[in-house]
A protein has these predicted regions:
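Short beta-alpha connecting loops at secondary-structure transitions
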Residues: 258-264, 285, 308, 415-423, ...
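A short helix-to-beta-strand connector/capping loop
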Residues: 306, 438-445, 479-483, 552-554, ...
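Conserved acidic residues
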Residues: 55, 159, 246, 308, ...
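Flanking helices and flexible, charged tails adjoining ferredoxin-like Fe-S electron-transfer domains
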Residues: 201, 365-374, 397, 401, ...
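N-terminal Rossmann-like dinucleotide/flavin-binding domain of flavoprotein oxidoreductases
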Residues: 413-459, 567-593
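Rossmann-like dinucleotide/flavin-binding elements
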Residues: 377-407, 446-454, 458, 466-475, ...
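Flavin-dependent oxidoreductase catalytic cores
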Residues: 1-382, 386, 391-397, 401-402, ...
Length: 673
């Protein structure tokens, strides 16, 4: 064991069983849970993380009955047949040396089907169905269903269960005055509102006996109006412990909350102090979670606070060998999760199978295999952006001899720009990872080298990952000195105090955030909490207060040609954060805009097909974020020389900057070579 992380890598004795370290792979729905035919893929997915050293794995959520389904016919643990099927998962994890819990999750009013139930018949703002009020008899049946699901999990070979009581699902709905308007034994007083989850834990313990882990995932800060008070939260923790819980896991925010808790702009370890405060009131281990992604931070948390375990879900998607690398003194080789959500949670919330932007093998362990090549080939990769880096590293990992050409002085491509956006500083970790891997696998990196046909002749395979160039729209005055590309704006060009941003896609939102922010709140937890109104839960019910955003550094206009709301194509789980942030920073968003001309006075615009309401935006600068064009100027020359290049990333498709697609294409190509 390395001395760098002595607490993180130390075992935890639970009395009847021992966890090999303090690392928990937190629950995340992958989409593989919902179909019986995907059970082998799910087993392989978990087994790879167990082989990578994770101490305790928690599955995605399984409903204890049909009203608890997230979707019709979604994942469930209600029958002996379900339990038998899950033996493949538990056997695979145990053979790899790990332990695994089944999460039991009742969606309540978050269910996407007309049979949903809740504490009261109050519709969720994020689902189309109004739930039916669960009757007193229905409450009792649901408690028994949780206990039955836990018994089935034991039959399936699970080491325990996690009872999902946070994130606004059914148990949380009973706990909060916001959603529980009952006046019977299951509502009214705080004690009655707690009765439902506490009774679930008690009856579950009776059903499974003493030698079985029961982890209760509790909401430690709801971040919604009329959420739980601190006294209620502490009382729940102590009562859940008394009812038989082994572990207490941390949850923060409901899915409808307007305080972000998981996106990359949330400061690292933002909620650890809350988990530690709860831990002071209980005698069972408390698990810290949310925005913890590197072993140095995890070790510090365990050393400085009262928590005893660290839960990380997305970091284990990004790098299944996270624990092994930390234990071997190779933390610099960890493919650090950047909390982008683009291939994981954004997929989950539109009911697609989950993967990882940085690791497209996640969830595809049985189909996307990077095994040793039978015949090493000389491979040239042109372009060191995300696509080229993934292709180069993956090909070299398989045993190919790889040369990487990059016209610029550094690797990273669009990630080198993205890391400068407030809230995206961690994108630099991806560049660090690839820099390390290029060296580890012996890739010959040629910076400041614009490869031509002559340089590429003689390679067995040539990969064009030459990326994109900003598209220049046809606007009179586009050559005016006050006009900047988004790359120039982000890279340090002098910019005035009033700016128009042309193009309201993802790049336009990022550039606007860059322009209105002097210092990133992601790097200052106090400022971030003030901006979002995230209160100390010990001082405010629901952990909410009035947001106090920092004053914008500049006056910014964000413009788009199309009508309608801006940012509709942003990520499902992060788009609302970007929109809310720009609104708080007083960015003026204008849609249906015609760009008439740019001159010394500023940007002249009008609106609609009839070019109505002409006006002048008297701005100091105009930043162009109007899309990209593929850079493929090498292709024709290569083909003329008899070389058929592989084209990936932005060089293949430039409609949107899409690192998810780029890294996936690079990895898949390397697997085929």
């Amino acid at each position: 064991m390395t001395s760098e992380y002595p607490t993180l890598l130390s075992p935890l004795d639970l009395g009847f069983t021992t966890l090999r370290n303090r690392v928990v792979m937190g629950s995340m729905h992958t989409g593989l849970e919902d179909r019986a035919g995907d059970i082998n893929a799910l087993a392989a997915y978990f087994a790879e993380r167990a082989r990578g050293g994770v101490g305790l794995i928690i599955t995605g959520g399984y409903a204890p009955n049909r009203t608890g389904w997230l979707l019709p016919f979604a994942s469930q643990m209600i029958s002996a047949a379900d339990a038998r099927r899950h033996r493949r998962i538990t056997d695979a994890v145990h053979e790899a040396g790990g332990k695994i819990l089944l999460q039991i999750l009742h969606a309540g009013r978050y269910a996407y089907h007309p049979f949903s139930v809740s504490a009261s018949a109050i519709k969720s703002p994020i689902t189309p169905f109004r739930p039916r009020r669960l009757s007193a008899r229905g409450v009792e049946r649901t408690i028994d269903d949780f206990a039955h699901a836990a018994s089935l999990a034991a039959e399936a070979g699970y080491d325990g269960v996690e009872i999902m009581g946070s994130e606004g699902y059914l148990l949380n709905q009973f706990l909060a005055p916001r959603t529980n308007k009952r006046r019977d034994a299951w509502g009214g007083s705080a004690a009655n509102r707690r009765r439902f989850p506490v009774e679930i834990v008690r009856r579950t313990r009776e059903a499974v006996g003493d030698d079985f882990i029961i982890c209760y995932r509790m909401s430690m800060a709801d971040y919604v109006p009329d959420g739980q008070s601190w006294d209620e939260t502490v009382a729940l923790a102590t009562e859940v412990e008394a009812a038989g819980a082994t572990l207490l896991n941390s949850g923060f925010g409901w899915h409808e909350a307007r305080v972000p808790t998981i996106v990359t702009s949330v400061p690292n370890s933002a909620f650890v102090d809350i988990s530690s405060a709860v831990a002071e009131h209980v005698g069972i281990p408390v698990v810290a979670s949310n925005r913890i992604n590197m072993p140095q931070a995890a070790e510090q948390i365990l050393a400085d606070t009262q928590v005893q375990l660290i839960s990380m879900a997305r970091p284990m998607l990004a790098d299944p060998d996270w624990v092994a690398k930390a234990a071997d003194g190779r933390a610099h080789e960890i493919n650090t999760c950047i909390s982008c959500n683009q291939a994981c949670l954004d997929h989950a919330f539109v009911h697609k199978k989950v993967s990882c932007l940085l690791n497209p093998r996640a969830g595809r362990e049985t189909t996307l295999v990077l095994g040793p090549t039978r015949r090493a080939r000389n491979v040239a990769v042109v372009g060191a952006g995300p696509a080229g880096l993934s292709a180069a590293v993956s090909a070299a990992q398989r045993g190919h001899v790889v040369t990487l050409f990059e016209a610029g002085p550094v690797i990273g491509g669009q990630f080198d720009l993205a890391k400068r956006i407030p809230g995206k500083e961690e994108f630099a970790e991806t560049i660090r990872y690839y820099t390390t891997m290029l060296d580890k696998y012996g890739v010959s990196v040629r910076l400041n080298t614009r490869a031509g046909v002559a340089e590429l002749t003689g390679f067995d395979e040539v990969v064009l990952a030459t990326g994109v160039a900003p598209r220049i729209p046809d606007i009179p005055g586009i050559e005016h000195p006050k006009v900047l590309s988004y790359a120039q704006a982000i890279s340090g060009a002098p910019i005035g105090k009033s700016v128009a941003v042309i193009g309201a896609g993802g790049v336009g939102f990022d550039v606007s955030e860059f322009l209105v922010t002097d210092a990133s709140p992601t790097l200052n937890l106090k400022e971030w909490k003030a901006e979002w109104g995230a209160a100390d839960p010990q001082e405010a019910r629901g952990a909410l207060t009035t947001p106090i955003p920092a004053e914008p550094a500049r006056e910014v206009y964000l413009l788009q040609r199309s009508k309608g709301r801006q940012g509709t194509r942003l990520g499902k789980t992060s788009g609302w954060v970007h929109r809310a942030s720009l609104k708080a920073k007083k960015v003026q968003q204008l849609s249906g805009v015609n760009y008439e001309r740019i001159d010394d006075a500023g940007l002249h615009i009008s609106f609609g097909p009839d070019r109505k309401r002409p006006q002048l935006l008297a701005v100091d600068n105009v930043v162009i974020c109007a899309g990209q064009e593929s850079v493929r100027d090498l292709e024709d020359g290569l083909r003329a020389a008899g070389i058929r290049p592989h084209i990936i990333g932005g060089a293949a498709v430039a409609a949107e900057l899409d690192a998810k697609r780029a890294i996936k294409q690079g990895t898949e190509l390397a697997a085929r070579l």
